[in-house]
């Protein structure tokens, strides 16, 4: 029962419209061969979890498999138990002590100090990365700057900026799935960037029977 609650599947029907911090969605869920009365009452078939597979219990090379599974590599390559991982990064604009507000944009390298050791090339004019763009390690996903002055007592001084961008670190192919901009209760804008990545079963993943 406990593992059934943790099973990967479709956790809500509107997951494509949500910006949850982290979400796991099974790409090809299937309904069980046998239904129960409770499953029909709570309409579990609308949010299925798990996949129907053919399981063989056998001795392998003369030794019994204990607490482990062997998968057909061809089935895994064709998408068996493949899942999509959604991860959301959130960034809120704030007002600094000097009264200046943060600006979400692509930094001007000639006027911005404190630039990160990262890739800014994928940032658009809004300070975000276009949807369905591949994100690699040390790419900037949310870019913004804070206006500063070299000398606060000199109003004629050229305004410069300090980088406040966010670097994304990953070791897998990740894409920008959706960008969302809005304002909070204080009137400041905030940005949410939902990222997605495809994953296949690897050593250490846990599986169980739902029957």
Report residues per predicted region.
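Conduit-forming functional cores of very large proteins
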Residues: 1-211
């Amino acid at each position: 029962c406990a593992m059934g609650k943790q099973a990967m599947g479709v956790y809500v029907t509107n997951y494509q419209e949500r910006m949850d911090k982290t979400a796991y969605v099974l790409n090809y869920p299937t309904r069980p061969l046998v239904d129960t009365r409770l499953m029909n009452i709570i309409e579990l078939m609308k949010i299925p979890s798990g996949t129907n597979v053919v399981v063989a219990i056998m001795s392998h090379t003369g030794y019994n498999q204990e607490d482990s599974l062997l998968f057909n590599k061809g089935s895994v390559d064709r998408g068996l138990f493949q899942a999509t991982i959604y991860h959301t990064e959130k960034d809120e604009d704030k007002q600094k002590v000097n009264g200046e507000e943060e600006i979400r944009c692509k930094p001007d390298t000639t006027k911005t100090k404190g630039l990160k050791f990262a890739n800014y090339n994928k940032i658009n004019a809004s300070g975000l990365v276009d949807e369905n763009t591949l994100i690699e390690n040390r790419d900037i996903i949310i870019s913004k700057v804070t206006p500063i002055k070299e000398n606060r007592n000199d109003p004629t001084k050229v305004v410069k900026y300090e980088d406040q961008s966010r670097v994304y670190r990953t070791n897998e192919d990740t894409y920008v799935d959706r960008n969302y901009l809005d304002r909070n209760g204080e009137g400041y804008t905030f940005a949410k960037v939902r990222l997605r990545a495809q994953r296949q079963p690897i050593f250490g993943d846990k599986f169980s029977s739902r029957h």
